[in-house]
């Protein structure tokens, strides 16, 4: 039964190994009828175990040939045999180099007709070689008949060539095959001796070719012999050691990347095992081969084009007279299907699906074996075919996990394959030059970690010096568990028996120590080591990564056992990964002072001495600081970011409890940054409370705050606020910006008191714009009040000069002047407020009109889609947002600008008329004062000067008429120019009106100030009054002013708009003739040097207008 199964498994042309037991059970018609000499020759060529221990995998199924009595039978059999043989060669080992091409005699003689195509000299050489071998065999048989008889009795291994069939019935018997050969010989007229010799040569060449293939496979996989015999299943495995770059798919040959089984490189024996297997008993070898033959059945895939042998019917003969030299797609598909069928047969043996592995996995396995973190997979198909495979059958866990990182506890030594060690070239003593293995290094430092080296130079053996001695030591110490063997990547081992262990080479962690790991048989130790390391596939190779916890354990172990000189801290200390934390400790004395004074301030005087004593006891016992976010000393905050009093008391109570807990033995004191920062938080929170409290409670709060926070720490002076006005946070800054100038504003929303409900930037800007007018108005009123108070204080503190000759008229005039000055200042302040308001409104309007929503509203309003009434209704909606309210207000304001300008113009006209009336009244009063003063001073200067000439009434009337004519002319000119400029800038006209009102108000103030100073400081002195007493010109001036005032007052009732024309006449005359100024007013301007320049300018305008009158030189001079 075993022979039948083996017969179905192997394809046509495969070698078959038989024993005596198998030969007795087999029928006689299954063997080829060979001569006795051929059987003896086959017996004399025994098969070695190393050559035939692993038969090749089954080739793809070939078509079944029916036995015919024609020459097609022999042709098909030989052709099928040759093709399957070539297929089996392709299946042998994809990773191995291709075998040398066979001799042409074996390729062509297999067909039966190939000798016709051979040249004459090749056929002659083959025949001579076969004849010489036959004669040599006959001589050896005759010389030693006893040995041949003993070999026949033993019958160790019989080799036979069987054309494979699916059933024994289809195999032709000996007579049919003999008739086939004789038919061939009859056709070709070839003697039977030559046919037998060709058959014998074919068998010999096939055996030689099979031996060449096996030798090439085993020779290429392991370049050097191992130093000792292997007692375990894992030690004989050979690994193809590749560089890190070779593991990438682009640098490997295509055969390495094919879907091969994992055992493509791991199933072959090392040369030492092959040498050991030659000495084995042939009976054990044959029985082992019988056991390793798996039961196989034909499996037909539905996608295959040709069915396997076991499924195909026997009545489908395919007759081909030519040998196959080129493969079609269907034949290649058959080859692939056969390979997969063989994999399925192999996998069913161990009931595990085959895992397809590439050479990357094999390289990873080799490196992990060198690192001693490889767990052998316990499946039977990775086990070597040796007698030692039965010793560890109880360890089968059927666990196919490849990178398992715990040690095999049944292995006495730690190095898995010593042939790899010797196959590595000798390298200098540097640590891990393989780029695939990344060492543990510090960030920012180029130093390697010194924990990777041995303690003594004796422990590190060189490959060049003591290789044999060192290997003997390793072999002698294999049975000791206390031996710690370290494998470095340059092919060297350091042995340390009964010594303190090194730290692991690859950054592997140590739970307790290496000796404890070796001694312990506990699974928890292995599981913890398995959890500490993992393998990561990177582009340049494989990276064994260790966790930070294991690195901490390793560093602690190395600090304990190292005997090296300490390096400076700045040179070697530093984080080893980005996950490490840098701990900063300090502020020793400052923290103590802060805690003492904090306890004093909070009334904890009893615990002060205990805390100071506690600090001195535990001053140098530091532990690592807790995370800041998880600290239990963080005081609680309410929604307004204020520290409650209860929270502060709770914090101090917890601090007191912590200080009591620190008295326990062995407990270290940790540096708490929250304690250090607590006083600063108190300061800022109290200052923030001050901003939220009503103003009447703020002085008490400030006093308490200054008492509380004066002695907290020397750092608090840098963190403290300078005053209540400066904001200690961004929230306070916004709050102060909103509440500035209107702290008691009822329109302020209550939500602004909460920090968590901060308004948006748009809302803040809208509120600032909306409240800007109110702020300006309030500040302007305050400025007005302050200015009036200043005027009052100056007038009260003004030195009273001697009242020399003042009568009732002069006193009344002085009071009236003061009252008019106050009124004019009020009008000036109002005008400044209006100007500032108009300027802010224009800026605000321009900013709002530039927005897209405002422009859309304006466009719809001009098109008639919406009305002003609808906008007003929307404006009255309380739920309207500030941005929309601003937009609607700006649109309405822009559409009403024309009406507002007209109203503003009327108001300015009324204001200007009142100002001019008050100015004329002041001039009239001044004329009266001048007349009285002149009357008093005239008798004193009679002997020196003549009496001044009095102007007649006709002169005054003529002067008034000239002024009226000039005014009418100027009015006509203004009307013409206004028509031209009216379509221009309306905004500029509005500003011109404001400036005119300013100048109108400033002019009487300047006149009254100048004359008032002259009256007060003069006191009857001619030179102090500032008027040169030239007699006639001064009298002319005073009389002219007086007459002018009379005529102008009479004209003003008839001309309501004469004031504006008069003002414009002044301006234009000043622009046209700025150089014409009368000499008689120079002293007056010099005395009025303390007045404002604008006032001087107004006075000059008035005088230049008078000097422009026609015939003025003839009339007055």
UniProtKB/Swiss-Prot annotation:
Biased composition (Low complexity): 679-712, 988-1001
Motif (YXXXXLphi motif 2): 363-369
GO CC field: cytoplasm; cytosol; neuromuscular junction; neuronal ribonucleoprotein granule; nucleus; P-body; terminal bouton
Residue positions, PTM Phosphothreonine: 503
PANTHER family referenced in this protein's UniProt entry, alphabetically: EUKARYOTIC TRANSLATION INITIATION FACTOR 4E TRANSPORTER
Domain notes: The YXXXXLphi motifs mediate interaction with eIF4E1.
Protein name (database record): Protein cup
Role according to the record: Adapter protein that plays a central role in localization of transcripts in the oocyte and in young embryos. Maintains RNA targets in a repressed state by promoting their deadenylation and protects deadenylated mRNAs from further degradation. Binds to and recruits eIF-4E to the 3'-UTR of some mRNA targets which prevents interaction between eIF4E1 and eIF4G. This may contribute to translational repression but does not appear to be necessary for it to occur. Can promote translational repression independently of deadenylation and eIF4E1 binding.
Observed effect of gene inactivation: Mislocalization and precocious expression of orb in the ovary, accumulation of high levels of orb in nurse cells, elongation of orb poly-A tails, hyperphosphorylation of orb and reduced osk mRNA levels. Reduced number of germ cells.
Phosphoserine modification, residue list: 263, 270, 347, 350, 509, 513, 520, 523-524
Organism placement in taxonomy: Eukaryota, Metazoa, Ecdysozoa, Arthropoda, Hexapoda
Entry keyword set: Cytoplasm, Developmental protein, Differentiation, Nucleus, Oogenesis, Phosphoprotein, Repeat, Repressor, Transcription, Transcription regulation
Pro residues compositional bias, start-end: 54-64, 95-104
Alphabetized GO MF terms: eukaryotic initiation factor 4E binding; mRNA binding; RNA binding; translation regulator activity
Subcellular localization(s) per the UniProt record: Cytoplasm; Nucleus; Cytoplasm, Cytoplasmic ribonucleoprotein granule
Quaternary state and interactors: Component of the osk RNP complex, which is composed of at least exu, yps, aret/bruno, cup, and the mRNA of osk. Interacts with the decapping activators me31B and tral. Component of the nanos RNP complex, which is composed of at least smg, cup, tral, me31B, the CCR4-NOT complex members Rga/NOT2 and Caf1, and the mRNA of nanos (nos). Interacts with btz. Recruited to the 3'-UTR of nos and osk mRNAs by smg and btz, respectively.
Motif YXXXXLphi motif 1, residue numbers: 327-333
Effect of residue 327 to A: Strong reduction in interaction with eIF4E1. Strong reduction in interaction with eIF4E1. Complete loss of interaction with eIF4E1
Region (Disordered): 1-106, 270-326, 493-528, 596-618, 654-673, 679-728, 984-1004, 1016-1051
GO biological process per UniProt: dorsal/ventral pattern formation; female meiotic nuclear division; follicle cell of egg chamber migration; intracellular mRNA localization; meiotic chromosome segregation; negative regulation of eukaryotic translation initiation factor 4F complex assembly; negative regulation of oskar mRNA translation; negative regulation of translation
Consequence the record notes for mutating residue 364 to A: Mild reduction in interaction with eIF4E1. Complete loss of interaction with eIF4E1
Source organism, top-level taxon: Eukaryota
Predominant subcellular localization, coarse grouping: cytoplasm
Transmembrane among keywords: no
Tissues in which the UniProt entry reports expression: Predominantly expressed in ovaries and in 0-2 hours old embryos. Weakly expressed in testis. Expressed in young embryos through stage 9, then it decreases throughout the rest of embryogenesis. In ovaries, it is expressed in germ cells throughout pre-vitellogenic development, but is not expressed in the somatic follicle cells. In germarial cysts, the protein (and not the transcripts) is transported selectively into the oocyte.
Pfam families per the UniProt record, alphabetical: EIF4E-T (PF10477)
Family: Belongs to the 4E-T/EIF4E-T family.
């Amino acid at each position: 039964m075993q022979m039948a199964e083996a017969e179905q498994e192997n394809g046509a042309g495969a070698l078959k190994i038989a024993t005596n037991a198998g030969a007795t059970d087999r029928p006689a018609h299954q063997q080829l009828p060979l001569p006795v000499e051929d059987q003896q020759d086959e017996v004399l060529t025994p098969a070695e175990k190393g050559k035939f221990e692993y038969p090749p995998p089954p080739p793809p199924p070939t078509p079944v040939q029916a036995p015919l009595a024609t020459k097609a039978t022999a042709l098909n059999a030989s052709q099928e045999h040759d093709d399957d043989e070539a297929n089996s060669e392709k299946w042998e080992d994809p990773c191995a180099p291709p075998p040398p091409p066979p001799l042409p005699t074996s390729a062509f003689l297999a067909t039966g007709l190939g000798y016709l195509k051979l040249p004459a000299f090749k056929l002659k050489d083959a025949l001579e070689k076969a004849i010489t071998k036959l004669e040599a065999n006959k001589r050896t048989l005759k010389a030693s008949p006893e040995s041949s008889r003993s070999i026949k009795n033993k019958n160790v291994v019989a080799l036979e060539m069987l054309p494979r069939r699916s059933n024994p019935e289809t195999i032709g018997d000996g007579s049919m095959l003999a008739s086939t050969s004789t038919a061939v010989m009859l056709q070709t007229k070839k003697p039977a001796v030559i046919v037998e010799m060709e058959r014998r040569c074919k068998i010999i060449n096939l055996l030689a070719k099979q031996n060449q293939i096996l030798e090439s496979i085993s020779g290429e996989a392991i370049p050097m012999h191992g130093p000792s015999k292997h007692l375990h299943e894992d030690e004989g495995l050979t690994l193809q050691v590749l560089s890190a770059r070779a593991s990438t798919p682009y640098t490997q040959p295509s055969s390495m990347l094919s879907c091969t089984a994992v055992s493509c490189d791991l199933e072959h024996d090392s040369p030492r095992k092959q040498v050991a297997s030659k000495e084995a008993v042939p009976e054990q070898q044959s029985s082992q081969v019988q056991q390793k033959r798996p039961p196989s059945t034909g499996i037909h895939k539905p996608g295959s084009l040709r069915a396997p042998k076991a499924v195909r019917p026997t009545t489908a003969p395919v007759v081909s007279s030519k040998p196959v030299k080129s493969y079609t797609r269907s034949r290649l598909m058959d080859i692939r299907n056969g390979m997969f069928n063989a994999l399925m047969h192999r996998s069913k043996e161990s009931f595990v699906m085959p895992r397809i592995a590439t050479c990357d996995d094999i390289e990873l396995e080799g490196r992990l074996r060198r690192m001693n973190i490889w767990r052998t997979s316990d499946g039977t198909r990775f086990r070597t075919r040796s007698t030692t495979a039965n010793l560890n059958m109880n360890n089968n866990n059927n666990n196919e996990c490849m990178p398992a990182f715990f040690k095999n506890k049944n292995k006495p030594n730690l190095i898995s394959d010593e042939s790899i060690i010797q196959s590595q070239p000798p390298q200098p003593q540097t640590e891990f030059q393989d780029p695939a293995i990344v060492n543990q290094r510090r960030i920012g430092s180029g130093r390697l970690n010194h924990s990777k080296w041995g303690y003594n130079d004796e422990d590190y053996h060189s490959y060049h010096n003591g290789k044999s001695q060192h290997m003997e030591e390793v072999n002698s110490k294999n049975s000791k568990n206390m031996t710690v063997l370290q494998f470095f990547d340059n092919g060297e081992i350091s042995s340390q028996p009964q010594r303190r262990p090194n730290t692991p080479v690859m950054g592997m962690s140590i739970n307790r120590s290496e000796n404890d790991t070796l001694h312990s048989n506990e699974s928890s130790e292995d599981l913890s080591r398995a959890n500490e390391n993992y393998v990561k596939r990177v582009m340049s190779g494989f990276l064994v990564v260790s966790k930070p916890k294991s690195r901490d354990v390793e560093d602690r172990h190395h600090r304990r056992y190292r005997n090296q000189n300490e390096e400076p801290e700045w040179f070697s200390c530093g984080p080893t990964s980005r996950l490490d934390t840098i701990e900063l400790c300090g502020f020793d004395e400052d923290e103590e002072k802060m805690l003492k004074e904090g306890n004093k301030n909070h009334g904890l005087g009893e615990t002060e001495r205990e805390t100071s004593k506690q600090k001195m006891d535990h001053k140098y016992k530091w532990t690592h600081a807790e995370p800041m976010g998880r600290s239990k000393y963080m005081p609680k905050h309410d929604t307004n970011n204020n520290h409650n009093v209860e929270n502060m008391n709770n914090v101090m109570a917890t601090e007191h409890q912590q200080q009591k807990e620190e008295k326990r033995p062995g407990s270290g004191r940790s540096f708490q940054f929250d304690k250090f920062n607590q006083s600063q938080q108190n300061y800022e929170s109290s200052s923030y409370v001050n901003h939220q409290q009503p103003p009447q409670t703020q002085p008490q709060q400030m006093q308490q705050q200054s008492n509380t926070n004066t002695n907290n720490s020397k750092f608090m002076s840098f963190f403290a606020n300078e005053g209540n006005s400066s904001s200690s946070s961004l929230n306070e800054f916004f709050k102060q910006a909103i509440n500035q100038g209107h702290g008691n504003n009822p329109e302020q929303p209550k939500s602004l008191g909460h920090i968590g409900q901060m308004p948006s930037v748009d809302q803040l800007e809208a509120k600032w714009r909306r409240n800007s007018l109110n702020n300006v108005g309030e500040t302007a009123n305050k400025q007005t009040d302050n200015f009036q108070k200043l005027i009052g204080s100056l007038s009260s503190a003004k030195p009273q000069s001697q009242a020399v000759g003042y009568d009732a008229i002069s006193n009344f005039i002085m009071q009236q002047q003061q009252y008019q000055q106050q009124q004019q200042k009020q009008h000036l302040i109002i005008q400044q407020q209006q100007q500032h308001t108009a300027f802010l409104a224009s800026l605000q309007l321009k900013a709002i009109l530039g927005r897209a929503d405002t422009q859309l509203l304006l466009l719809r309003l001009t098109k008639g889609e919406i009305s002003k009434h609808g906008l007003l209704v929307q404006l009255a909606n309380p739920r309207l947002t500030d941005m929309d309210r601003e937009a609607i207000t700006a649109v309405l304001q822009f559409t009403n600008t024309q009406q507002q300008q007209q109203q503003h113009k009327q108001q300015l006209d009324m204001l200007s008329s009142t100002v001019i009336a008050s100015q004329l009244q002041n001039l009239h009063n001044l004329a009266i004062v001048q007349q009285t003063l002149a009357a008093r001073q005239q008798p004193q200067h009679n002997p020196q000067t003549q009496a001044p000439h009095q102007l007649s009434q006709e002169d005054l009337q003529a002067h008034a008429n000239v002024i009226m004519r000039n005014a009418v002319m100027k009015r006509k000119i203004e009307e013409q120019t206004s028509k031209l400029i009216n379509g221009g800038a309306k905004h500029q006209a509005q500003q011109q009106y404001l400036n005119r009102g300013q100048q109108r108000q400033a002019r009487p103030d300047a006149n009254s100030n100048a004359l008032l100073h002259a009256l007060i400081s003069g006191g009857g002195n001619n030179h102090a009054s500032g008027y040169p007493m030239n007699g006639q010109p001064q009298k002319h001036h005073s009389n002219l002013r007086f007459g002018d005032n009379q005529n102008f007052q009479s004209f003003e009732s008839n001309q309501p708009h004469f004031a504006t024309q008069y003002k414009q006449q002044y301006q234009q005359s000043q622009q046209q003739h700025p150089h014409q100024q009368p000499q008689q007013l120079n002293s007056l301007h010099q005395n009025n040097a303390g007045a404002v320049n604008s006032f001087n300018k107004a006075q000059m305008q008035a005088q230049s207008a008078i000097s422009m009158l026609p015939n003025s030189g003839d009339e007055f001079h």
